[in-house]
Amino acid sequence: YVEPILNKNGKIYVIISDALRYEVGDELTTIIRQEDMFEATIEPVISMLPSYTQLGMASLLPNKNIEFSGDEQATVIVDGINARSTNREKILNNYVSKSKTIKAKELLSMSKDGEDGTRALVKQNNVIYIYHDIIDNAGKLKTEDTVCKAVEDCLVELKQIIRKLTSANATNIIVTADHGFIYQNESIQESDYLGVQATGEKILYNDRRFVIGKKLNEQSSFKKFSSNQLGLKGDIL
């Protein structure tokens, strides 16, 4: 998606909205098409497994290989570099010079003109990744009932970001996500959880929906994948 535009000497602006599932993206497409001088298309894309923020964000960076580290946070490593926060810009610049990462709130607070304005930002960079997080924050513990409102707020803010970029002369914009979400309006009951625990040589990371570890045992309650099956490097998983 990005490389063909860069190969034509174009610039590209990628908005990554955490947990923006397909149906919300489809609604955003409709909203954009209603705007004068705007065109929009939508394509489904399957997220990485396990489908969670750290791995999803890493997979959206250009890379030769992705792997889990051996620490208890199962930190995601892209081409030998920890893929968290500010390192993402370093990874981008290893592939495309004049690349920038920025949070959506920071972008929205910028003026249009001046050395620190959005026009200068667009002019000075070939690739900009904008990180946006409304839906995923609402979906965290004790805030599940706010997800519907968060989706509405997300669409409003994404439209604002797109307008902010286009007013600064940006033309090629991609809106994507690290993963989607499963909606529920109440907390999961204890009886709904599995009654068995994952076992193996070493459990590194134990989430509500998945387990990351080394030489995990086969169990009927779990679906087991190797790193190789998921397109990852290493022997963790």
Which stretches of residues belong to each language-model region?
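Feature captures the catalytic ectodomains and active-site-proximal regions of enzymes
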Residues: Y1-L237
